[in-house]
């Protein structure tokens, strides 16, 4: 039986861990050096609920320089991974300020999974010290859940690409969301306006 094809687009602030999450999931290796993304595509096979799904993973650049290029990724998207970094409260703030309006404009009705990346840094001493200098602290799980409710996300998950904790669960939830969206009719596909 042929695999069902679904398209996943990942968005979020620059350096919040999007590319690492995709690479760890699709290639099972953690990239040690940071290279800002312009436009990358990966394909990964995943099985959920005894369905074979071929997931086209579309990486995007979070930097503002790419705000005009990013919408080229959106047409025909089945599910969005909207990411922030647990060690960056500012990246969580950009979820309702920047990412939700952009995604809901180009992809109305496409399910959104809110993902807290870099979970391993929540209890990291160096991270905590650096954030304290700015009178901040790592994002708490309940803050992520509250944000997911606020933006009407399909779900909220936390993961660490570095330790691989929670990575598979993110893509399983995303695949389930994409499969469910199909049942509501193909009218949900993203439009390029």
From Swiss-Prot:
InterPro entries: P-loop_NTPase, Small_GTP-bd, Small_GTPase, Small_GTPase_Rho. (Microbial infection) Glycosylated at Tyr-34 by Yersinia ruckeri toxin Afp18. Mono-O-GlcNAcylation by Afp18 inhibits RhoA activation by guanine nucleotide exchange factors and blocks RhoA signaling. GO terms for biological process: actin filament organization; signal transduction; skeletal muscle satellite cell migration; small GTPase-mediated signal transduction; wound healing, spreading of cells. GO terms for cellular component: plasma membrane. It comes from the Eukaryota. Its main location: membrane. SUPFAM superfamilies: P-loop containing nucleoside triphosphate hydrolases. Pfam families: Ras. Keywords: Cell membrane, Glycoprotein, GTP-binding, Lipoprotein, Membrane, Methylation, Nucleotide-binding, Prenylation. A lipid is attached at residue 190 (S-geranylgeranyl cysteine). Residues 191-193 form a propeptide. PROSITE patterns: RHO. Belongs to the small GTPase superfamily. Rho family. This is Rho-related GTP-binding protein RhoA-A. The gene is rhoaa.
